[in-house]
Every structure is written in structure tokens, then in C-alpha cells.
UniProtKB/Swiss-Prot annotation:
GO annotation, biological process: 'de novo' NAD biosynthetic process from L-aspartate
Broadest EC class assigned to this enzyme: transferase
Record's cofactor remark: Binds 1 [4Fe-4S] cluster per subunit.
Required co-factors: [4Fe-4S] cluster
Annotated protein name in UniProt: Quinolinate synthase
Pathway: Cofactor biosynthesis; NAD(+) biosynthesis; quinolinate from iminoaspartate: step 1/1
Gene from which the chain derives: nadA
Keywords: 4Fe-4S, Cytoplasm, Iron, Iron-sulfur, Metal-binding, Pyridine nucleotide biosynthesis, Transferase
Organism: Vibrio campbellii (strain ATCC BAA-1116)
List of residues binding iminosuccinate: 47, 68, 139-141, 156, 226-228, 243
Length: 353
């Protein structure tokens, strides 16, 4: 059983799209970035939702492409003293939480996440204080301050197991911040959950009606859906899962066409694994409606070559991530609780968004 809070009105100030670079400019920035990575003892770590050229550069230079938790864990293990995180701000914070001794740079600190923006730490903490009998479970797509208020931090692949574990102990749960993922988990587990009311601007736009029409055009296609999508979209899926799980599903499912309902940045890695298959963007918005994100996170798009070069060459307060040490230690507790639980289950934690 789930109870959804009244919607908190949050205005998401979408950033302007980066000015496109010419091929010559791209080549120049790529060469400069490669040189700077060596000079600064740095490694580029990119999320699946960044632009393909950023993911390609990360792989070419010995970096990494993955989900947010995989990114933080890779950075923790890598010998480089500086990590440049291609993603959104909470991902840089996660890297700093797990690897405090390293310098964490981001192309821009203005790369936000609507789930993070939709869950202000002060308001969320007040709500938690009003329900002291509830166990607080938060999605990884949150600020360090929200993580510090939680009992558990979860990723989408382990969330069901953790909620089932808590439900077996008859513990009521506060879930934040993604209402769609929370509803999906509540439906699957039957747990008593109070859901914070925020959503991912990308996944919230996927339309069940439009998806049905697309399925009519591609009747043999499999539908892959991230659980941050509305329930009506999830119900149409052949496979539901996190970014890493969807990539795995694309490889394992027999269909040769895949309709993919998540950020289209994922196509870069997915196509690498299934070059023989046709990947199709799931439709956003509805009939006559205009999409806002259009299946690509506007903040992820801020991680351009120019911004990466500037972060490496200039650094400074506009690019470096700092997390208060007391807050870092506190937020590490629920994160380690998840990692320990996953180890007990003998499973590999694969991440969120």
C-alpha cells in the first residue's frame, strides 16, 4: 500500500542547450582534453546519459561509462588523483562521498537533476521528522544532505530487495524522491510506503498512448522501460529495469527491434552490445503535445567538450565538488548499509538513472 504526498510544485529551470561545435572544434577540444587528462593525473568518468562523443572519449582515454553508483565505485578504485565526472551534480557528490581524498571536478556545477531539485533537504527532513516511526529510504538520485537524513540509500536494481526486507520486518517506509519508482516498488512488494512526489523530467514524459501506437508500427519489437516512467508505460514493458539492466535485457531478449523508454543517451552503450539490433526511441508527450526533455536530460547535455576542457584547465570553485566532512560521514552510513546488504545477497549492485 502506498500513499503519495501532495505534489510539491517545483519549477525546473532548463538550461540552454550548448552551442554546437564544428568537427574541427571537436577534434581540437578532444586533443586538448587528452593532453590535460595526462597532465592533471585525471580520469574522465561519464554517465550513460551523456552525449555519445563524451562516452566515447571516456572509453578511449581509459575512463569509464556507467550508472551513477558504478561511476563512483570506479573512481574510488582508479589510481588517478583527479576524477572528472560527466553527469549531474549528485553524481559528483557521490564520488566525493566514497572518495574524499581525491579531487572531484565536473564540467559544470549547474548540471542539476529534477529528482534532486524536487526533494529539498529541509522540506524532506521536516517530513521525515513528522513520521519518526518510518524507515527512510532514498534513491541515489539525491543530494548528500538528503542521503544523510536517510536510513537507506538504494539504486533501482536493489530497491525491491531492500523494501521487501524492511516490509518483512513490518517497518513502514518513507520513500523519496521518485514517485513513479516508488509506486512501482510499492505495487511489487505490497509494502506500506509514504511516497515523496518528485519525478525525472525525462521519464515522466513517456506516453502510454503514444507507445501503444508505436508498438502497432513495430509489432515484433520488445519494449524496454525504466521504472522512473509512469505506471501506464511500465505496464506495457517486456523488460523493466535500471540503465544497466536495460542494456542487459537488450542483449538477452530475442527480438531484433527494441523500443527503449529511457534517456536516449543509453543508445551508445546499448548499440555497442547489440550492433545487429534496431534501437527505437520511445515516444514522449502525447498527441498534440510538445515534449520538454524529448528523451534527453537537458542537464546531462551540459557536459560538452568545451566544458570538460575548461574544468580540467581552470578548475576552481565553478568546477570542483566539496562535501562537508560531517555530512559526508553521515551520508556514507546509509550508502554502506546498501552495499553491505547487497554483499550479503551475493549480488552486484547496478545503479539508478
Amino acid at each position: 500500500m502506498s500513499h503519495i504526498l501532495d505534489k510539491i510544485e517545483t519549477v525546473y529551470p532548463f538550461p540552454p542547450k550548448p552551442i554546437p561545435l564544428s568537427q574541427e572544434e571537436k577534434a581540437d577540444y578532444i586533443e586538448r582534453i587528452k593532453k590535460l587528462l595526462k597532465e592533471k593525473d585525471a580520469v574522465l568518468i561519464a554517465h550513460y546519459y551523456t552525449d555519445p562523443e563524451i562516452q566515447a572519449l571516456a572509453e578511449e582515454t581509459g575512463g569509464f561509462v556507467g550508472d551513477s553508483l558504478e561511476m563512483a565505485k570506479f573512481g574510488n578504485r582508479h589510481p588517478a588523483s583527479t576524477l572528472i565526472i560527466g553527469g549531474v551534480r549528485f553524481m559528483g557528490e557521490s564520488a566525493k562521498i566514497l572518495t574524499p581524498e581525491k579531487r572531484i571536478l565536473m564540467p559544470t556545477l549547474e548540471a542539476e537533476c529534477s529528482l534532486d531539485l524536487g526533494c529539498p533537504a529541509d522540506k524532506f527532513s521536516e517530513f521525515c521528522d513528522a513520521h519518526p516511526d518510518h524507515t527512510v529510504v532514498v534513491y541515489a538520485n539525491t543530494s548528500a544532505a538528503v542521503k544523510a537524513r536517510a536510513d537507506w540509500v538504494v539504486t533501482s536494481s536493489i530497491a525491491l530487495d531492500i523494501v521487501e526486507h524492511l516490509d518483512a520486518e513490518d517497518k513502514p517506509i518513507i520513500w523519496g524522491p521518485d514517485r513513479h519508482l516508488g509506486s512501482y516498488i510499492a505495487k511489487k512488494t505490497g509494502a506500506d510506503m509514504l511516497l515523496w512526489h518528485a519525478e525525472c523530467v525525462v521519464h515522466d514524459e513517456f506516453s502510454a498512448d503514444a507507445l501503444r501506437k508505436m508498438k502497432n508500427v513495430y509489432p515484433d519489437a520488445a519494449i524496454l522501460v525504466h521504472p522512473e516512467s509512469p505506471a501506464s508505460v511500465v505496464e506495457l514493458a517486456d523488460a523493466v529495469g535500471s540503465t544497466s539492466q536495460l542494456i542487459k535485457a537488450a542483449k538477452e531478449l530475442p527480438q531484433q527491434q527494441m523500443i527503449v523508454a529511457t534517456d536516449k543517451g543509453i543508445f551508445f552503450k546499448m548499440q555497442q552490445l547489440v550492433p545487429e539490433k534496431e534501437l527505437i526511441e520511445a515516444p514522449t508527450a502525447g498527441a498534440g503535445a510538445t515534449c520538454r526533455s524529448c528523451a534527453h536530460c537537458p542537464w546531462m547535455a551540459m557536459n560538452g567538450l568545451k566544458a570538460i576542457e575548461k574544468a580540467l584547465s581552470e578548475g576552481g570553485a565553478e568546477h570542483e565538488i566539496f562535501v562537508d566532512e560531517a555530512l559526508r560521514v553521515k551520508s556514507l552510513i546509509p550508502l554502506n548499509r546498501m552495499l553491505d546488504f547487497a554483499e550479503q545477497l551475493n549480488m552486484q549492485v547496478k545503479g539508478n538513472a
